[in-house]
Design a protein with these regions (language model features):
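Membrane-embedded alpha-helices of multi-pass transport/permease systems
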Residues: 34-38, 42, 89, 153-172
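Helix-coil boundary and interhelical linker segments in multi-pass alpha-helical membrane proteins
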Residues: 7-23, 80-92, 127-144, 199-211, ...
Length: 277
């Protein structure tokens, strides 16, 4: 959700369309929910072999596979209706996003770093935001997308560390397995890469010091996460994963306050400029 909100603020220069913003927020809830359902559907046999996930509703029988499919189809149908309200200009990106929802859980069986697929899926709303706000994509759009992918690899690796031993046993693939003994270090590097890319976004869009200060705070948060997972205790890895909401929130407020300051500064200096004229 946070990268989508970043994209709205940057593409609109701090004045996003409230209607589109509201529709996209609903869309994120629907598609993420659909993603969780289809992920649990494909992973149900594997989840039964993992200590942390063996009690999930599909595994325990609280929900049948038929009910899961019906729920998934219903969520996708609502997403399509929402797409029609937003506009068909983003149809290609939306279709790609729907495909990625299905591909991601399957990718964990075949791709060594499925978190890359996850990042591409989670960032798919960014070009859609740019199209509805500006009518086109741009370099900033691409950079925010790349930052989102890098960030997804970072935080989902923490999540994957929690299940690493079980994933190795059952043959699942993950970035945590790929990174080996450096599985607690590489996520921090990807956090740094994310922030470096966002610095470039800030330069391109002439963002103020408040934004860069928020990136510095986000770096402190990512440092805390690195320390948190150092012992690889599953509950601490999950906490580090969840803590990334703070990372995204800080950057969002950095953008928001940066644009609010720019607007207030313009209003304060405008009368003086007119007086000189």
């Amino acid at each position: 959700m946070w990268p989508m909100l970043w994209a709205f603020l940057i593409s609109s220069e701090g004045s996003p369309s409230i209607i589109y913003l509201f529709l996209f927020l609903i869309g994120v809830v629907l598609t993420r929910s659909a993603g969780c359902v289809i992920n649990d559907y494909f992973d149900r046999d594997l989840d039964a072999q993992v200590e942390r996930t063996k009690d999930r509703m599909l595994v325990s029988g609280q929900v049948t596979t038929y009910e899961a499919i019906i729920l998934f189809v219903g969520l996708i149908a609502l997403s399509i209706l929402l797409l029609m309200l937003i506009g068909l200009d983003i149809l290609v990106y939306a279709l790609a996003a729907f495909c990625l929802l299905v591909i991601y859980p399957i990718s964990k069986r075949y791709i060594k770093i499925p978190q890359l697929v996850l990042g591409i899926a989670f960032g798919s709303s960014i070009p859609m935001v740019y199209i509805v706000e500006t009518g086109e994509t741009s370099l900033s759009c691409l950079l925010i997308y790349l930052a989102t992918i890098s960030w997804a690899i970072a935080y989902d690796t923490y999540y994957a560390i929690a299940d690493k031993k079980d994933d190795i046993k059952i043959g699942n693939k993950s970035s945590a397995i790929l990174f080996g003994e450096k599985d607690t270090i590489y996520p921090f590097y990807f956090h740094i890469l994310t922030l470096v890319i966002l610095v470039a976004v800030g330069v391109i869009n002439n963002l103020g010091i408040i934004f860069y200060f928020s990136l510095a705070l986000a770096l402190l948060v990512s440092t805390y996460q690195k320390i948190l997972v150092s012992n690889r205790l599953p509950y601490q890895c999950i906490s580090a994963f969840e803590n990334n909401n703070i990372f995204g929130l800080i950057i969002f407020f950095g953008l928001l306050l940066s644009y609010l300051y720019a607007v207030s500064y313009t209003h304060l200096t405008l009368p003086t400029s007119r007086a000189v004229e």
